[in-house]
Amino acid sequence: MHILADENIPLVDEFFAGLGEIRRMPGRRINRAALEGVDVLLVRSVTRVDRELLQGTAVRFVGTCTIGTDHLDLDYFEQSGIDWASAPGCNARGVVDYVLGCLLALAEVRGEALARRRFGVVGAGEVGGRLVEVLRGLGWDVRVCDPPRQTREAGGFVTLDEVIAECDVISLHTPLSMSGDCPTFHLFDRQRLSGLRPGAWLINASRGAVVDNAALRDLLLQRPDLEAVLDVWEGEPQVDVELADLCRIATPHIAGYSLDGKLRGTAQIHAAYCAARGLEPTVELAQLMPGPALAGLTFAASAEPAEMLATLCRAVYDPRRDDADFRRSLQGDDAQRRAAFDLLRKAYPARREIDGLAVRIEGDNPALTAVVSALGARLLR
């Protein structure tokens, strides 16, 4: 069996070497010619996998080590009998850590207490749902908009218009869909963006085209009271440089790039492939996951909950380095910037997740215990 994998997918050898011959190449360069003789294709979101790519090839399994599937032509897979798998939830914790880091950075710049703001989460699937749990666990006021879930579950949801009208912070976590009952392409269009509350913060760590980038650029030029955090961009790896300059935090689609999430994605695809072929997995992620570099953190019982929150979040992620690296990359011509975007992602340093932290509190303080519990860190007793 022959396997072609995006070169940026980790642990491919460890999980798939016993199943066939592995070849790697950059995801954006995968084309029909590269698939000659290939049975299994392993990709990320940068590779569009559709009829044009696959027709006439021997590929019978496609695995994407990502949550989203908007780059896969699932209808064609079904028509052609091609098995496929994604990695739902693999990087959810990493994205939550990213959002928390950005919230802390914004609060510091604006001199505002996060506990006093009202949060709106648009899209409450694997990522957004986890974020809602964390924010509510911290005791913060959260509104949730998720029309597909609202049709299946009773209560607890609000409309998008209510989120825009009522929330000071809006974080987007929807898939990208162009049609259907709940299309999300330009979900935040010019009209909806114009309705943002004074001083609102908008965070997009979902898909670039969920927000009309040109409309957001125009709005930020007119509304200096607003703050924008963008990790995803329309037309990636091409980026609107003027829009990036106007964002408080701008990063190159790395919100979910925790080491844990990347390895989890490969493990999930391996498990899905084995299930589809009736094989017993011979490798477990726990055998390959490295231990955290930070062994643990200890707090006195007198510590302030807000300071503890900031310390724990920044122990795993602070967006300011990624923001600075990204801004330095926005030089040169379009081709140079596109190459720099991909290079930042390819060479991204190892980042761990909050739930890998071990925390000790010297004494009894229920407020501190609540912070640890909300974040999902491990409390040592």
Swiss-Prot record:
User: What pathway, per the record?
Assistant: Cofactor biosynthesis; pyridoxine 5'-phosphate biosynthesis; pyridoxine 5'-phosphate from D-erythrose 4-phosphate: step 2/5
Asked whether the UniProt record includes Transcription regulation among its keywords, one would answer: no
Task: Report which reactions are catalysed by this protein.
Answer: 4-phospho-D-erythronate + NAD(+) = (R)-3-hydroxy-2-oxo-4-phosphooxybutanoate + NADH + H(+)
Task: Cite the CDD domains for this sequence.
Answer: ErythrP_dh
Enzyme Commission number(s) from the entry:
1.1.1.290
Q: Which residues bind substrate?
A: 45, 66, 257
Name assigned to this protein:
Erythronate-4-phosphate dehydrogenase
